[in-house]
Amino acid sequence: MAGSAAKKRGRGKSPLDLGKLKRAMEDCARDCERPLNIDLVIDVTAGDELINCLLEALRTQDPRTQLRCMLLAGELPELPAPCDLCVVAGGESLAVGEVLALAEGLPAPAVLVIEEGETFFAQTPEQAAELVGGSCAPDGSRTPAPVPLDAIVAVDLAASEPLAELGEWVARCAGEARLALAQRYPFCREQVARELVRKTALLNAGVGVLVMMPGADMPVITLNQAKMVVQIAGIYGQPLDLSRLREVAAVVAGAFGLRGVARELADALPGLGWGVKGAVAYSGTVAMGRAAIDCFSEGGTLNSLGAAITRAAEQLATQAQPGTGPAQ
């Protein structure tokens, strides 16, 4: 029954604007293909394991990406512009904060990476934030200039994915370069994809709550979901040439059942319809995004994603039936 109900909800004219979808695909392809200049500044007192881990993660044969390595030993290195990401491997030097300040002045997103639990200049990001940065006076004292805590990442080199926290930082803070970074570097790919899903789901929840005219929210929600799918496809290496426009549109069509659930529940609960629409817009977008991540991370294509999203729509429809709840 849930399957047939989802299919009925999927019928009708698509609210997706193909012209806007075309522009979204062009924008995503451009963002994914952009050249990258990445600076790795290595404090000479940093641990060998940390240095090797960062070098292995950031090296790439991709001709669109240039990795520039430099040492922090006494004098501050010169950071050439443009720079899309500056990673500082921290050791015992307190001058790493000044390197971050130089990078931010380019401007470029900059992060200090330290080993979790190691006794260098700090054992935690909180201690590092209090210590690093500032300038040396003639008497050798330092002028306090703490680095923001969100610019420091502590990594566990014994973990199965030691740079997972760095990947989370890239997803939050790398700005316009994050799609290209995620496409070329596996350590941050899933984190960037999940952040795209989170932001799109929150955006669509707001649309569902605020747009009260029946059906007026559908084109906006649909386009946001299409953009999300396109971006996730791009960072997982799916081709985004315009010959795939119809494929993307067909994939998004598989999510009409997700959006239909919101309409049905809003009609059934008129007093709470605005809240239900927002909640289901959020849940439907999350389900769609997770299906895309799972599909592409396992080597799937846009063609196979359509079936996965249809299954997600049917599952959400089943959970929304009276007397049922979310699957455990």
Predicted regions located by residue number:
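Conserved G1/Walker A P-loop phosphate-binding module
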Residues: G3-L72, R290
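Structural motif
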Residues: L40-A46, V87-S93, I114-G117
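Canonical P-loop GTPase G-domain recognition
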Residues: L50, L67-L72, T119-A180
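A short, well-structured beta->alpha microelement
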Residues: L55-D84, G90-G97
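Amphipathic helical hotspot of TIR/SEFIR-family domains
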Residues: A95-A108
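Active-site helix-to-loop segments that bind/position phosphate- or nucleotide-bearing substrates
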Residues: G175-V192, L196
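Membrane-inserting effector segments that mediate pore formation, membrane fusion
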Residues: R194-R290
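Charge-biased C-terminal accessory regions appended to nucleic-acid-, cytoskeletal NTPase
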Residues: V276-Q328
